[in-house]
């Protein structure tokens, strides 16, 4: 099937020329191109047109999960008949394994996996290996981290057809080899159950399952059915059952893998003994022998990913497989907000390696664990075929790759101008801000407020709640899908003010926002440099009444450059509007369009009749963002209580009694929830 773009409008403003230049560049074999597009100029729509023109599988890579969710929703709207995948880290909580030699403290790996995100990851990879070329995968930096061998994953696909001759027992063995588990009681994702001649499979990457009926050694019927109520959806002549996990190891080579692990362990233990490190030698020997026995008996162990090089049959030092290996060689890579995404991709390898080197040096892991890692930047570049950088503020790397040549998209189809920027003193800034918020709320508009720290964001939200202003805060500790829910709330008018730190920036499509207030704008640094100020100010560029207020007591170079660039763009935009007789207008999106742009929520059973299913303001006054995490099982919430108690005790030891009190309240809430779950 070919990509077929569906939109109620046609390219306008600078879009037609940008689409033509980018398409011609790809067809002429250019490796790198840069789209410099201002906020609200329709960069996503431009890229969608380019994808339709070149008809290639596409990876859209961006730097934060909130933006991934928005782009996923937009591409789903543009390409409803094509495959659009969502690929981010599936952890709600992740504490990596680490060792701190100074205090002799070993921190065991701790994590909580979000099953819905895992389902979306599996769905994206399954679609890629299905052979279809009309696929777009929107991903975070998680796509450069190690995954299973795509060849083994593809070999693990079970293809069945009506009338096929295969014994029921043989089919069940195939399911087990594909990492499905048998379960008669709890029919979870990635399990199957057997009732007489019928086998039900709960597909881990879909919302439905397969029901296969046997007649002797022949498949008599294949049906798809709703796993929640068992009702039949339809009949099939053919079906493909993809593996239940991305980490599929070859069973026939397991014994050889274990021998190789033990050989490396012996060599490393001998090295430790030769250098007088007897404690490290004993620690490593005990740990590896235990892991080997676990793998031999159960097929896995805690931290099995540290042995991935052996299971993947890779040579020492070679890169791991990742999502990019699942794409065909001629895929198109679009790096959105490249000024943020490129540095993030570059930094992953170094941080991971420094942590693991300590684990290896002190006998907690084998040297081969260093090969369980994200790609370094050179490896990432080597996998790219053709790349389009997209940013309103491209950095030196993008400009160097394209020889300083950019495709500029400054004029918006809506005729909207960059919002004017006002500078106001920080004295009485809160009173002034409240006056401005009141004006916007009366008009039915929304407001974004950015602070310098997470604590300031939370305190600001509490203050606004106390004076009956409907608000929420959002920062990196708010769960992935909860961030999208909060943005949906803002757009639908359930809340009027959103307070943030560094997430209220790149790419967020919020036409309802007419005021962006930046507190401490003169505190020069990472959060208040030219790129940050430009990106944050751009959130008001989708509204005809957009205004940006810098609360500052002095003019910094970053502030001045931001204002100068804004004035330059406004001049060009005004001239274009006069020439073409365009009157600027806000694009007000319908309720259905808002739900469409945040459609990633709908995969977790989101109920459109109750779209505000997150914590209320009363709870937020006393409980921080991480307290709202949804723990679905008793073991999960017990682990969370233990973790919170440790953090509370540490805060008390550090004499941070406000934080300790907050954590105490959080722990009490979770204990109450645990009691209700056990009742």
PLM regions: where:
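Short amphipathic alpha-helical segment within the helicase RecA-like ATPase core
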Residues: 69-77, 97-99, 459-463
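Walker A/P-loop
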Residues: 28-50
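Pre-Walker A (Motif I) flank of P-loop NTPase domains
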Residues: 27-34, 56-57, 133-135, 445-446
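Conserved pre-motif I regulatory segment
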Residues: 1-36
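Conserved strand-helix element at the start of the C-terminal RecA-like helicase core
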Residues: 57-69, 86, 139, 277-280, ...
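Conserved helicase ATPase core of P-loop NTP-dependent helicases/translocases
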Residues: 459, 478-501
């Amino acid at each position: 099937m070919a990509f077929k773009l569906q939109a109620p409008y046609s390219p306008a403003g600078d879009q037609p020329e940008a689409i033509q230049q980018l398409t011609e560049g790809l067809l002429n074999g250019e490796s790198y191109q840069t789209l410099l597009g201002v906020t609200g100029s329709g960069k996503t729509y431009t890229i969608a047109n380019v994808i339709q023109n070149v008809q290639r599988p596409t990876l859209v890579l961006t730097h934060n999960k909130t933006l991934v969710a928005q782009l996923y929703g937009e591409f789903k709207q543009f390409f409803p008949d094509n495959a659009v995948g969502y690929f981010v880290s599936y952890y709600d909580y992740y504490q990596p394994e680490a060792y701190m030699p100074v205090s002799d403290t070993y921190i065991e790996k701790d994590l909580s996996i979000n099953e819905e995100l895992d389902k979306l990851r599996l769905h994206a990879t399954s679609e890629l290996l299905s052979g279809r070329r009309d696929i777009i995968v929107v991903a975070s930096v998680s796509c450069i981290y190690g995954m299973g061998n795509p060849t083994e994953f593809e070999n693990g696909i079970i293809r069945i057809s009506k009338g096929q001759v295969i014994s029921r027992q043989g089919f069940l063995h195939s399911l087990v080899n594909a990492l499905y588990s048998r379960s008669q009681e709890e029919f979870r994702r990635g399990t199957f159950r057997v009732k007489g001649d019928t086998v039900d499979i709960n597909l881990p990457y879909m919302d439905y399952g397969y029901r296969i009926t046997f007649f002797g050694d022949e498949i008599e019927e294949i049906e798809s059915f709703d796993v929640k109520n068992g009702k039949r959806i339809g009949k099939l002549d053919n079906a493909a059952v993809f593996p239940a996990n991305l980490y599929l190891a070859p069973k026939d080579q397991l014994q050889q893998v274990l021998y190789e692990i033990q050989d490396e362990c012996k060599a490393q233990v001998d090295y430790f003994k030769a250098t007088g490190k007897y404690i490290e030698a004993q620690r490593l020997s005990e740990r590896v022998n235990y892991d080997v026995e676990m793998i031999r008996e159960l097929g896995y162990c805690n931290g099995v990913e540290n042995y991935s090089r052996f299971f993947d049959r890779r040579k020492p030092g070679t890169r791991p497989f990742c999502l990019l290996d699942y794409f065909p060689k001629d895929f198109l890579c679009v790096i959105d907000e490249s000024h943020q995404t490129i540095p993030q991709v570059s930094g992953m390898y170094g941080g991971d390696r420094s942590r693991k080197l300590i684990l290896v040096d002190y006998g907690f892991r084998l040297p081969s664990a260093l090969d369980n890692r994200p790609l370094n930047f050179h490896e990432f570049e080597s996998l790219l075929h053709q790349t389009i950088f997209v940013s309103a503020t491209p950095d030196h790397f993008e400009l160097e790759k394209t020889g300083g040549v950019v495709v500029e998209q400054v004029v918006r189809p809506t005729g909207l101008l960059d919002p004017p920027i006002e500078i106001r003193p920080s004295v009485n800034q809160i009173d002034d801000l409240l006056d401005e918020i009141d004006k916007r709320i009366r008009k039915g508009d929304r407001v974004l407020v950015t602070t310098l720290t997470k604590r300031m964001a939370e305190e600001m939200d509490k203050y606004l709640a106390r004076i009956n202003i409907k608000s929420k805060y959002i920062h990196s500790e708010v769960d992935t899908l909860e961030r999208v829910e909060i943005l949906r709330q803002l757009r639908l008018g359930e809340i009027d003010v959103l307070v943030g730190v560094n997430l209220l920036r790149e790419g967020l499509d919020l036409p309802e926002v007419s005021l962006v207030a930046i507190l401490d704008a003169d505190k020069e640094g990472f959060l208040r440099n030219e790129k940050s100020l430009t990106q944050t100010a751009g959130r008001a560029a989708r509204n005809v009444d957009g205004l940006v207020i810098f609360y500052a007591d002095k003019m910094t170079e970053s502030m001045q450059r931001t204002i100068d660039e804004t004035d330059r763009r406004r001049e060009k935009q005004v001239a274009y509007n006069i020439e073409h007789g365009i009157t600027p207008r806000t694009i007000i999106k319908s309720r259905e369009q808002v739900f469409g742009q945040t459609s990633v929520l709908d995969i977790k059973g989101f109920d459109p009749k109750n779209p505000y299913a997150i914590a209320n303001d009363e709870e937020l006054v006393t409980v921080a963002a991480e307290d709202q995490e949804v723990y679905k099982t008793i073991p999960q919430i017990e682990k969370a209580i233990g973790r919170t108690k440790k953090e509370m005790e540490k805060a008390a030891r550090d004499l941070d009694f406000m934080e300790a009190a907050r954590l105490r309240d959080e722990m009490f809430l979770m204990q109450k929830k645990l009691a209700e779950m056990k009742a």
